[in-house]
Amino acid sequence: MKTKTCKNLISNEQIQEVQEVYDTFKCRNGEMDKINIQYGFRALGVRLGEEEVEKIFKNQQYINFNSFLDIVTPLIYKIDVYASFEQAFSLFDRDGSGYITFDDLKTVAINLGEARSDSKLYNMIKRADLNGDKKISKIEFIQLLYWKKIY
């Protein structure tokens, strides 16, 4: 059943929040229609276009809670993962420049008690630096985490 998979992607508190949003925007028949689903998604911080909504409601007028949860869970998970990546990036981007430099990486390594040689730190930058500017942008950092499956 898909709901079990959903429970693995988001927390019980998030599932409870989805339930509260569903209960707030459901129709009198206990299910959600095309109009109210848009409100529900927005309340959860998710934006869907008209075409995506049409796909959800293909050949039906309403969806039940389990369907709503199955649809919204991966979207919430993506938002959470991206937010976690941004938070991790900001820990490395010590000066808020939008980049992780060699000095940023070295400072973090020292603060974590990770003794790394300069050459190892430069190699770490080099592996993540996709455009060759000798620093890691937020996009490069996130791509590295996805590529290495560190999430």
Curated annotation (Swiss-Prot):
GO molecular function annotations of the record: calcium ion binding
Residue numbers binding Ca(2+) 2: 129, 131, 133, 135, 140
GO cellular component, one term: centrosome
Protein name: Centrin-A
GO biological process, one term: cell division
Location of the protein in the cell: Cytoplasm, Cytoskeleton, Microtubule organizing center, Centrosome; Nucleus
More details: Binds two moles of calcium per mole of protein.
Homology family: Belongs to the centrin family.
Key word Repeat present: yes
Signal peptide residues on this chain, from the entry's feature table: none
Gene symbol of the encoding locus: cenA
Keyword annotations of the record: Calcium, Cell cycle, Cell division, Cytoplasm, Cytoskeleton, Metal-binding, Mitosis, Nucleus, Repeat
Organism this protein belongs to: Dictyostelium discoideum (Social amoeba)
Source species taxonomy: Eukaryota, Amoebozoa, Evosea, Eumycetozoa, Dictyostelia
